[in-house]
UniProtKB/Swiss-Prot annotation:
The record marks 363 as: Required for activity. It comes from Nicotiana sylvestris. It catalyses: ATP + H2O + 4 H(+)(in) = ADP + phosphate + 5 H(+)(out). F-type ATPases have 2 components, CF(1) - the catalytic core - and CF(0) - the membrane proton channel. CF(1) has five subunits: alpha(3), beta(3), gamma(1), delta(1), epsilon(1). CF(0) has four main subunits: a, b, b' and c. This is ATP synthase subunit alpha, chloroplastic.
Length: 507
């Protein structure tokens, strides 16, 4: 018979009691009532916050958007094909946030900041809320530094400043994305971090943009956030906020950032889809009542920070597609009223060979010449006025048969000015080259050339000026002013190049 040693048993029991650690874990849970179309209705989750992340049994994450009396409406961040009626859901206690770090530069990521370029994980130790408050009035200062796009038409007449929000608007296939990518290419060497957010675009279009940026060495300072047309509506809705959170990370580190949203109207459509499925009441064009707030809270995050916060900046270029030039639709009017100006691209100009197809007459920058260097102000002042007068005259000249000499000269000058605004895609110009081009046109040096010769002459003049008069570039870049010395150098170069050009053409 086995002897029971009471002291040994009591020691074991005592040890177990001492080691016992009473941990009580309270989890806020609920049950799936209904799931489908990217939406789940949950019973329970009594203390869930608006916008809180919830986790389903099979691992899918969702966001609690509708808090109703007897259920919670959750939008899914994934297809949710494995979620079943009756399965459990738990609240995480967290609002949507993403990891942020310098390591994101040069990468292509999705709305959850996960890499989708097949180049491995991205290391990050810091997190930022996807939706954070925009800087207040005291935290900002007025926009005063230029953000050069490299496009003459924009930098001279519709200047963009660091911290500004400028809308790019136009019909499909008018070169809106091309204007944005050229602006990214022109930031090379300017110490500006660029974020390109593709919302609901074709995967082939996004791949094309990424390839262009890689070939030109621009991916080194660029982050691409992509949620293509086949992504769930929730992720298309979140993508712009993810891009803004990444740009803010750099802005608060005293850096300059440029963010391009391509395009917010697709985000509004995704949000409309989510809202209608959540049975929120529809408003104009079936968009929910808070669609203005959707875009205003996003674009208000763009700012030029005050000197106490390090003077970082975030410049936003939202791109909105219109239907047959109708800017009075709901989303275009909303975004126009939020932004500090718009660049209007016209299908008629594009089809007539004027590219970039910027309609200078109705494009505007509300920051204006505050976002230009002095040299640009000096030469570009006359340009917009002359082009506006030319557009008016051209319309009138179609009906008039005999025009006086002065009108003919003005029409000839206008045609040449319009010609100098044309640029090839992915060929941005430096400020010095732009100043030289505008000066040559507005001072009548191109009047003696045929319209077809203008671009060829300007290309050769830029090369000639760079090799034979390097002091011109030095003066403009160091003083930011179009001095008399710079003007004399430029006049000399134009005259010398004109003589060479005429001899070449005659030969």
């Amino acid at each position: 018979m086995v002897t029971i040693r009471a002291d040994e048993i009591s020691n074991i029991i005592r040890e177990r009691i001492e080691q016992y650690n009473r941990e009580v874990k309270i989890v806020n849970t609920g049950t799936v009532l209904q799931v489908g179309d990217g939406i789940a209705r949950i019973h329970g989750l009594d203390e869930v916050m608006a916008g809180e992340l919830v986790e389903f049994e099979e691992g899918t994450i969702g966001i609690a958007l509708n808090l109703e009396s007897n259920n919670v409406g959750v939008v899914l961040m994934g297809d949710g094909l494995l979620i079943q009626e009756g399965s459990s859901v738990k609240a995480t206690g967290r609002i949507a946030q993403i990891p942020v770090s310098e390591a994101y530069l040069g990468r292509v990521i999705n709305a959850l900041a996960k890499p989708i370029d097949g180049r491995g994980e991205i290391s990050a130790s810091e997190f930022r809320l996807i939706e954070s408050a925009a800087p207040g009035i005291i935290s900002r200062r007025s926009v005063y530094e230029p953000l050069q796009t490299g496009l003459i038409a924009i930098d001279s007449m519709i200047p963009i400043g660091r911290g500004q929000r400028e809308l790019i608007i136009g019909d499909r296939q008018t070169g809106k994305t091309a204007v944005a990518t050229d602006t990214i290419l022109n930031q090379q060497g300017q110490n500006v971090i660029c974020v390109y957010v593709a919302i609901g675009q074709k995967a082939s279009s996004v791949a094309q943009v990424v390839t262009t940026l890689q070939e030109r060495g621009a991916m080194e300072y660029t982050i691409v956030v992509a949620e293509t047309a086949d992504s769930p509506a929730t992720l298309q809705y979140l993508a712009p906020y993810t891009g803004a959170a990444l740009a803010e990370y750099f802005m608060y580190r005293e850096r300059h950032t440029l963010i391009i949203y391509d395009d917010p109207s697709k985000q509004a459509q995704a949000y409309r889809q989510m809202s209608l499925l959540l049975r929120r009441p529809p408003g104009r064009e079936a968009y929910p009542g808070d669609v203005f707030y959707l875009h205003s809270r996003l674009l208000e995050r763009a700012a030029k920070l005050s000197s106490s916060l390090g003077e970082g900046s975030m410049t936003a270029l939202p791109i909105v597609e219109t239907q047959s030039g109708d800017v009075s639709a709901y989303i275009p009017t909303n975004v126009i009223s939020i932004t500090d100006g718009q660049i209007f691209l016209s299908a008629d100009l594009f089809n007539s060979g004027i590219r970039p197809a910027i309609n200078v007459g109705i494009s505007v920058s509300r920051v204006g010449s505050a976002a230009q260097i002095k040299a640009m102000k000096q030469v570009a002042g006359k340009l917009k006025l002359e082009l506006a007068q030319f557009a008016e005259l051209e319309a009138f000249a179609q009906f008039a048969s005999d025009l006086d000499k002065a009108t003919q000269n003005q029409l000839a000058r206008g045609q040449r000015l319009r010609e100098l605004l044309k640029q090839s895609q992915s060929a941005p110009l430096t400020v010095e080259e732009q100043i030289m081009t505008i000066y040559t046109g507005t001072n009548g040096y191109l009047d003696s050339l045929e319209v077809g010769q203008v671009r060829k002459f300007l290309v050769e003049l830029r090369t000639y000026l760079k090799t034979n008069k390097p002091q011109f570039q030095e003066i403009i870049s160091s003083t930011k002013t179009f001095t008399e010395e710079a003007e004399a150098l430029l006049k000399e170069a134009i005259q010398e190049q004109m003589d060479r050009f005429i001899l070449q053409e005659q030969a």
